[in-house]
């Protein structure tokens, strides 16, 4: 075949395994672009065939003229391949390179929408092309590779059937109608939350899955009923606000922070921001702060897991009076801004100088561990005992945890500010965390030196998924979390924690001068002690209160077994329903089973709904961009290794990919991993803290980039320059 001089060709893969109705390998094989000669074409055909591996007679290649003058290119799927729901999912790139999307390159954007709803202007010409392709091939579920030229001409490169693992019942129209009914119920729920917040005087309607208490990280985006109920009762109903009110922030104890919408836990951003404003700030100024902070998040939704660091100040930091923060709150007059910062300064001094907090933390840990030690799990106990354990965890643990966590946030924020202003060396925060002798490092040390029985006596209550009853604890043989024969912890754990980093006299002098100019009533020695105490107390209180929660779930499992209910069924109960069962005192088994079935049906109807991580308006649920997150890079180290997941047989020397991880996933640090990447999480989330403790390179909160990185075989994390590179 002779190639004309006028236009280059492209050879695309068309292997038999790519286009079957039972599986799809789209994007797996090679495509070769820019072919101008017969020799190039011949070599490209051979190379593409070679990329298939073992050949079959049905394998082909596809030769096309290359599209010219491309403005936008990408892939559109006309349904969600995981659920079969009729979402249109468009992944596209505006660089003009037609291979970026299929090769998993950077810069790709994704827009998800329901048929019949509007799309961004650059994509509107794609809609009639989708309809035309579907009519031609006679299949609704298709994957279309396309380009749009600068003249708005849509070019279709390839069409494949989509392999769906979801439900295909009913006609296509029935499925669209069903999705719209579900989304209209979600829209009504959002409007209910908005009306409630309006009634509480909270301006703005932004919701998110990761601000503040990080529900997506701790219970996931589609939690079961019991996990969601426990999390809200223990943390997000009142504990969060009670702790902040004690420090001098605004009192929001009558306002829940987290709302279940479409089966997803969403944080009310207006409530969160309001709770970080000092109580002495006048109402008109507070309203401006809330509005400005939400405007910032709406403009940069990728900051949803960093709101305390980037969206609203929760303490006074050095050099805040001018620059970025002042510009961000432009609706405040200079006098209002000054008085707002003065109020933050008074509150910051109170938090840092409040040494009694750590005495109370030590007493609280002792009470929690004593209560846990008195628990004897046996079937003779009843549901009332379960509720009592949970209440002890709330009364003695979660409010205290919220207090020490807030103190640790303040410590971290000030330390990060000192690093940013080069008043302390880069990596100083990581060194402080390493020296705090917190729970993660202690667990790794204990695993290295203790016999299994002794280790499990200390840590056996920990559960990956603190609130999820279906997940085995460390001391449950079903879990098989630890390799006791081949122990491979990172480094050489010792009983003595790392020494605290030491500043030179000149550095201390500069920091103290900065503290004086900021208006702090404390010096460097007092702040350093506060920071180490806060970081250590946060982890120890978390460890202690989770013990009672874990024991309560095990007690519930024993009672459930006696009633003929398994853990799967129990996971669909809620605390109010368990309390109602206690009052009934008869026919518990039938009542609880009926409740579990009803809640499971509700969960099944919402668990495949695609909802945005940040909701600015109810209409967003019908069409939204999946924004590219700004991950937090922990430590300044570089590491490369095989991509691994928690279900892999061996994690040793791998870089672990995990969507979300609470304290129960600390077992992974006993498996000799070299690094970690999470989909959800922020600068101060659990895995960030653990990575700092252990000096482990980590990328926390990868968001939309998580999947493309996870699909690699070998990857490099360059944390100092905040870069992830796919090696192969």
Regions found by a protein language model. Name each.
Residues 2-26, 30-31, 55-69, 144-145, ...:
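ATP-grasp fold ATP-binding core
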Residues 399, 414-421, 502-608:
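Extended, domain-scale alpha-helical bundle/helix-rich regions
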Residues 1, 21, 39-47, 57, ...:
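Conserved divalent-metal-coordinating catalytic cores
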Residues 25-53:
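Glycine-rich active-site/cofactor-binding loop and its immediate structural neighborhood
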Residues 9-15, 56-64, 143, 407, ...:
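Short coil/turn segments at secondary-structure boundaries
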Residues 10, 62, 655-659, 676-677:
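Structural motif
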Residues 11-14, 48, 390-394, 531:
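Short alpha-helical scaffolding segments that buttress acidic/His motifs in well-ordered protein cores
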